[in-house]
Regions:
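Core beta-strand elements of the Rossmann-like FAD/NAD(P) dinucleotide-binding domain
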Residues: 22-24, 128-137, 264-274
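Surface beta-strand/loop "capping" patches
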Residues: 352-397
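Glycine-rich dinucleotide-binding loop and its adjacent helix/turn
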Residues: 8-10, 14-16, 144-184, 188-193, ...
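A conserved FAD-binding loop/helix module that cradles the flavin
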Residues: 319-367
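A Rossmann-like FAD-binding core segment of flavoenzymes
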Residues: 87-124, 200-287, 385-418
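FAD-site-proximal beta/loop scaffold in flavoenzymes
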Residues: 14, 140, 162-172, 275-326
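Beta1-alpha1 glycine-rich phosphate/pyrophosphate-binding loop at the start
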Residues: 24-87, 91, 179-223
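Extreme N-terminal leader/targeting segments of oxidoreductases
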Residues: 1-25, 426
Length: 455
């Protein structure tokens, strides 16, 4: 098992107590897989980099993800979450990247322009007191949080025994605590599926996984490996409609739902259990982003960014799950390396016209989703060049085509193939397509995923 040795890199209280401000080129907020990848890429580009992390260790959520499945793309081998994280921790330790651990960021404020760029001040608090870090660029890599019971408004009493799936995962894998002995899982997201298997391995009886939608929301491999292989039932178009219990959960009421996702009267049944785990969605942690003036995309609840992952606030970049929820840590790493390299280019004034959208380039296109596309990212294109587009569909479809539209004109059409909401899709948008849109005089291009009726 990988270990987390922070002896040489931790920002000790005694070393920063007398320092009010420290200057860097790039300040990365978040020490998980996104933050570490961004920091390493920025450092490789020659920037002076700092990572601010609220926990006492680097690694983020991967520290509690002890299951395999990481690294297949990035390292070409299968690793557990801690093993995957440790590889980046070791790389960070081998550099002079400054670490501020156990430090909570209070805010990000833009300063006066200096040498044609904005200087940002990141104010943080740790056991030594308040400290300010300045940077020409800031990378937001705070990750995401789980949606709670109160956010989905499950009726019933409020007994002990209701957990988010991620919290239960931490209890079992980090704290060595057993959250219950008989559980129901609401939601078939990947964390819920993984916890169904983990609970079973720990001797906790899983009464079933209940999913509101008529399809599983997790990756197909997780449905097979975590449910099918362990004989755990998956109940689609079914939800929890009441929590029963006084001091502790005693049972939950589940009901089938109709095509409008409303409970169907007469389908209620009681499932005895002492624990309810919720895997009902992830929300990017963007309170800091909003306070810094960053515009959020209503579809992703992450920042609106351009092709370099720069937000609408010059010098502030975003990557990983704080930008949009990913399926795989490997994809987070790849995206975050792009953000870190772009942040360094911005901070150092290197290659701004190529990598980071600059004023005067004459390119300003917004990208909007249509059809069954749930979102399109980036939301803005500010340079003419090969651009990677990410999107996710809102419902599964056996046959659909991706189309890029500018007004009434179709600029690009992909092959007909199936799409699933559980899989984040991406494809390269050629520079000639972007230039064509500009030649048409439009200010918006549309990424549309349109179902195709098979003959």
């Amino acid at each position: 098992m990988a270990t987390f040795d922070m002896r040489n890199k931790r920002a000790e209280a005694g070393t920063i107590a007398s320092v009010a401000t420290q200057a860097f080129d790039v300040v990365v907020i978040g020490g998980g897989p996104a933050g570490m990848a961004a920091a390493l890429a920025a450092h490789k580009a020659g920037a002076r980099v700092a990572i601010v992390e609220r926990e006492q260790h680097l690694g983020g959520i991967l520290r509690q993800c002890i299951h395999p499945g990481f690294g297949l793309s990035h390292f070409k081998q299968e690793l557990t979450g801690p093993e995957y994280a440790q590889r980046f921790i070791d790389q960070v330790h081998a550099t002079d990247i400054a670490l501020f651990l156990g430090s909570m960021v209070l805010g990000i404020d833009s300063g006066e322009p200096a040498e044609d760029t904005e200087v940002h001040t990141v104010t943080l608090m740790n056991p030594a007191g308040m400290l300010q870090l300045t940077g020409r660029a800031v990378v937001l890599a705070m990750g995401c949080r789980e949606r709670t019971r109160s956010e989905i408004k499950i009726p019933g009493s409020r007994p002990a025994g209701v957990f988010t799936a991620g919290l239960a995962q931490r209890y079992i894998n980090i704290e060595n605590l057993k959250p219950g002995s008989r559980t129901v899982i609401l939601g078939s997201g990947d964390i819920g599926l993984i916890m169904a298997r983990r609970c079973t391995l720990e001797g906790i009886s899983v009464e079933g996984v209940y999913e509101l939608m008529p399809y599983a929301n997790g990756l197909r491999r997780n449905v097979k490996n975590c449910l099918d292989d362990f004989g755990i039932p998956l109940h689609l178009s079914t939800t929890v409609t009441r929590v029963i219990g006084h001091d502790r959960v005693e049972a939950v009421e589940v009901s089938q739902v109709d095509e409008h996702l409303a409970p169907i009267p007469g389908t209620e049944r009681i499932v005895p259990c002492d624990t309810l785990l919720l895997s009902v969605g992830l929300i990017p942690e963007n309170e800091l982003s909003v306070a810094a003036g960053v515009e959020l995309d209503p579809h992703t609840r992450g920042a609106v960014v351009d092709q370099s992952l720069q937000t609408g606030v010059p010098g502030i970049f975003a990557c990983g799950n704080v930008l949009h929820v990913h399926d795989l840590a490997d994809n987070v790493t790849t995206e975050s390396e792009r953000a870190g390299a772009a942040a360094a280019a911005y901070a150092l004034g290197n290659g701004a016209d190529d990598e980071v959208g600059a004023a005067g380039t004459g390119c300003e296109l917004t990208v909007s989703p249509a059809g069954i596309a749930g979102y399109a990212l980036p939301g803005r294109i500010t340079t003419v060049g090969l651009t990677k587009l990410n999107f996710r569909v809102r419902r599964p479809v056996d046959a659909a085509r991706v189309r890029i539209l500018a007004g009434d004109e179709e600029l690009f059409a992909g092959k007909v193939r199936p799409f699933k909401p559980s899989v984040m899709e991406s494809f390269p948008l050629p520079a000639k397509v972007i230039q064509h849109a500009l030649d048409l005089g439009v200010s918006e291009i549309v990424l549309s995923v349109d179902p195709v009726e098979e003959a």
